[in-house]
Each structure stands twice: as structure tokens, then as C-alpha cells.
Amino acid sequence: MGRAFEYRRASKEARWDKMSKLFPKLSKAITVAAKEGGIDPDMNPKLRTAIATAKAQNMPKDNIDAAIKRANGKDSSDIKTIFYDGKAAHGVQIIVETATDNPTRTVANVKSIFSKNGGEMLPSGSLNFMFSRKAIFEVVKPSGDIEELELELIDAGLTDIEENDGTLTIYGDYTSFGTLSEGIEKMGLEVKKGSLQFIPNSTVNLDESAIGELERLLDKLEDDDDVQAVYTNIE
């Protein structure tokens, strides 16, 4: 998703009722990370980052601990991360990231949302060549030299860095998530958010009318309980 459109969508996240919308998604991200890499944060960079992201959103410690414990529960083995591809009007391409214990339910819901809101599902993997998977971290901008920070993190896998309103967005290839996470920690940077995301290789520039037309579809997808993230090629 283009950065300008991403910031626009972030304003919606800020308005979400955290208890009913954001916290369950953060909790599921923690459980999935713990299930994939173990429940010890010291040995699991993805889990450490998921916890840091939750803390940055003021998620209570009890919720975080419960999410980690669920990774060892009898139901956790059924939770899977599944991606669905789709398209909408104006050349918009969409990748939907889900975490679900019932893929049959999830695919039916996602397909219904697309079909009822002017979109269409595509075979899974259809858009892989249109997007690049990246490790992306948002950190509080430190007081020191940004160029020096950039040089320090290149060896850890940094490929790009952006600055916006006191926040640094750090990019790396998805295979560098662990080393980049550790490099950021070693530098003492405060993580606001960290995850693997799909970034479009090319974008479409839409006017306000077209964006308004598409936002209903995107809202419906993001509001589904099984959906963790929605990525688009909108500038």
C-alpha cells in the first residue's frame, strides 16, 4: 500500500475501539508468533516485536500474557496464517492476511465481502509478483544522527528508511526480520510497530471519489474478525 494511503488508513485504526477491534488482532498476532517461534520472547524476535507493538498500543500486560499462553493451548495448533488475493475497480489489487482456526469460514467470509462490495477474489498467489514482502518497523525517532543509525542497521538488513512526524519507518527484506529486529533492539530504539507486510511494486493513483468508493470494501475486510491486515496497491 502506498505510504500516503497507508497514513490515511492509519487514522481509522486510531479511531477503533481498542478493546473490540485492535486488541483482538494484536492478541492473535502474539499467539501466532509464539506458536511459530516459541513462547520465549528472548529466543523469538517475531514474538518480541509483536509484544512491543501491543505495548505501544497500551494493550494490558494480562492480555499479552494470555495471548502467549494460548500458543500452548489445545486450540492454538489450529490457528493458521492464510493469504487471499483479490481485485477491485480502478485496477486496485488487494492481499488479505488472515489468522484463522477455521479456513472454510474465513474464505467464505472474505469471498462474500469481495462479491458484495464490488470486488472479486483471485486464486491465492496470483498477486505475489505484484508485491514484495518486507520487514517493516516503525520506531520513535532518536535524537542522534539518522545517517549513522542507517549505517549501523545496513548490516542487520536495512534497505530503506523514511522519516515522518517523529517516526522512522525502517524497511528490510522479509528474510531479515529477525536480524533487523535485533539490530533495532541493540540500538535502544523504541519500537511502535513491527511486522511483515506486502508492499506494491507499482501503485495506482486514485482521486477522492474512487477512494471513497473502495473504502467500503476495505473497511469490511479489515473489520472481519479473522483478518489481520489488508494490503493494496493504492498510492
UniProtKB/Swiss-Prot annotation:
<dbReference type="InterPro" id="IPR049083">
    <property type="entry name" value="TACO1_YebC_N"/>
</dbReference>
<keyword id="KW-0238">DNA-binding</keyword>
<protein>
    <recommendedName>
        <fullName>Probable transcriptional regulatory protein CFF8240_0424</fullName>
    </recommendedName>
</protein>
<dbReference type="InterPro" id="IPR029072">
    <property type="entry name" value="YebC-like"/>
</dbReference>
<dbReference type="InterPro" id="IPR026564">
    <property type="entry name" value="Transcrip_reg_TACO1-like_dom3"/>
</dbReference>
<dbReference type="GO" id="GO:0003677">
    <property type="term" value="F:DNA binding"/>
</dbReference>
<keyword id="KW-0804">Transcription</keyword>
<dbReference type="GO" id="GO:0005829">
    <property type="term" value="C:cytosol"/>
</dbReference>
<keyword id="KW-0805">Transcription regulation</keyword>
<dbReference type="InterPro" id="IPR002876">
    <property type="entry name" value="Transcrip_reg_TACO1-like"/>
</dbReference>
<dbReference type="Pfam" id="PF20772">
    <property type="entry name" value="TACO1_YebC_N"/>
</dbReference>
<dbReference type="InterPro" id="IPR017856">
    <property type="entry name" value="Integrase-like_N"/>
</dbReference>
<dbReference type="GO" id="GO:0006355">
    <property type="term" value="P:regulation of DNA-templated transcription"/>
</dbReference>
<dbReference type="InterPro" id="IPR048300">
    <property type="entry name" value="TACO1_YebC-like_2nd/3rd_dom"/>
</dbReference>
<comment type="similarity">
    <text>Belongs to the TACO1 family.</text>
</comment>
<dbReference type="Pfam" id="PF01709">
    <property type="entry name" value="Transcrip_reg"/>
</dbReference>
<keyword id="KW-0963">Cytoplasm</keyword>
